């Protein structure tokens, strides 16, 4: 019985971050990404090598990075003011949009 409870608790711990990341709406994120495209491009692959590829990144990683830029925990002269006005919903939507694009998570053949 204890093993079953432990397994359920472990599963909940593992799956909870995935559920939180899945809350974003990729379609809304695409509409909200207009400012992002100036550096990260329409396809999320960056317009130059100095800009990070967002396409295919994990949504939870993208959301965490944006929240850290917004709070000042992560510093970047360009990203801090970009993330500052974003709501949690905006961040979830943007993260879902960029995670939905072909990119880093796309298997190669």
Model-derived segments and spans:
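Bacterial N-terminal signal peptides that target proteins for export
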Residues: 1-10
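Electrostatic cytochrome c docking/interface patches
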Residues: 15-33, 47-50, 103-109
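Gly/Gly-Pro-rich "capping" loops immediately C-terminal to redox-active cysteine motifs
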Residues: 26, 30, 45-74, 80-85
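The canonical Cys-X-X-Cys-His
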Residues: 34-42, 94
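Detector for the c-type heme attachment site
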Residues: 39-45, 99-103
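C-terminal capping alpha-helices of c-type cytochrome domains
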Residues: 74, 84-109
